[in-house]
Amino acid sequence: MRPYFTRERFGQPQSFAGLLLLAFLAQALWLVHAELRTAREPDSAEAMRIGEGWKQWNGRGVAAAPVLDATGIPQDPFRTDESGFDAEHSPLLYVVSAAPLLLWPKDLGGESATYWRWLPRVPFLACGVFLGASLWYVARRLCGNTGGFIALSFYCFSPSLIQASAVWHTEPEIVAAWGAFGTIFTAIAVAHTLYAPREVVLWNWRRIVLLGVSLAIAVGSQFSMIVLVPMALGFLLYVAPVRRQAGLVIWIAACVVGLALLFGVYFFHPHEFAESMRRAGFWGATWRAFTVLGVYKQVAVQIGRACPALAVALPVTLVTYATWPRTRYFGNSAPLLVAVLFFLLGMAHPHVAGGGFLLAAIPFLFIFVSGVLADLLETQYRPLVMACTGVVLVFSTASTLLALAQVPQG
């Protein structure tokens, strides 16, 4: 049997990518440490997630379906309807937050809060690392090693993604972002396999399961991510137009897998699942937001917070994409299209869901920018492009590290 850790599978590129991801994790851990160093009790949102998740793990009902006052945790009027059901999320985030606490051998008291309060953040830190690894894998396949490292460098020193992974004064939107990224690129990968003359379901069952898992993670973390279901179908049919019937079969199978996993998040309680689905806010868009100038400013701020380097790199790559036909191929166009769509959906959802769409757009934007830069690096201007890209990455990294150093304790 061929060994797994061969030079081809795990060489210098993988080692360097691992170091970048460790740097990302270290920055997120620093944020968690800065917050938990003095704060002995979780804030109201985190306390609600932990309390509701703990309730479900201990068989006292389903998390946020509905939120029960008897637990001692107040209802959040911004995230629950009048019946106490969370209209934005399934129990996934609650269950994931509380799951690591099942391993804590002592009481969850204030004396030991310095230690156990790290545990609810572990799943979200892991999601941040997994999203970074997924981004590097996709960017490397699309743009080569150089493009992959550019995208991963953007990601690993992105203030907004570091903050989201650490859940530092924000919602755990990193889970929905990871699910969205996995859904889109798994659908594209599955579509490419349809050109091989093999049985549709038998050969693709692993990718079907992976697509279903990605859908369950995304929709379970944010109900409005249901838009990924038709988006996945669109990519399946577009990439493999000669085998659209096979693509439709795979899409249906993946949706069934995703629905089963989402039902499992409710611990297979049919009544709570049905009531939660009935009250879920799958579509809360309002087009009035597009008439408000402040919404556009907020999107611009989000892009700047995502990566300071985008202030220079994004305009350059957009102009290049518009004026140079060579860059307008599927590998660049698809992530740009998804990023733009997510930005529009973020603007149309001014409440909790909007932040999830805006964050989910950022990894796709990194793929697009790195892809266009990789194309520019193949021209006669490679030395100039390489120098400018290096300067931009150094500036972005330095500004992020400086901002982290100035984070107040507590």
Where do the PLM segments sit?
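Perimembrane helix-loop-helix junctions
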Residues: Y4, A191-Y195, V227-V257, T323-T327, ...
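Transmembrane-helix signature of polytopic, membrane-embedded enzymes
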Residues: G18, G110-E111, L135-S158, W178, ...
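Short helix- or helix-capping micro-motifs
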Residues: A23-F24, A151-C156, F185, L215, ...
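Transmembrane-helix motifs of polytopic, lipid-linked glycan transferases
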Residues: T114, W118-L142, G182-T186, V316-A322
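Membrane-interface transmembrane helices that cradle and orient dolichyl/undecaprenyl
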Residues: R140, T183-R207, A218, L373-L376
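Short acidic/glycine- and proline-prone juxtamembrane loop motifs at membrane-interface regions
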Residues: A166-V175, G354-G355
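Hydrophobic, aromatic-rich transmembrane alpha-helices
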Residues: L237, R305-Y329, V340-F343
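Membrane-lumen/periplasm interface segments of specific transmembrane helices
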Residues: Y238, L248-V292, F395-V407
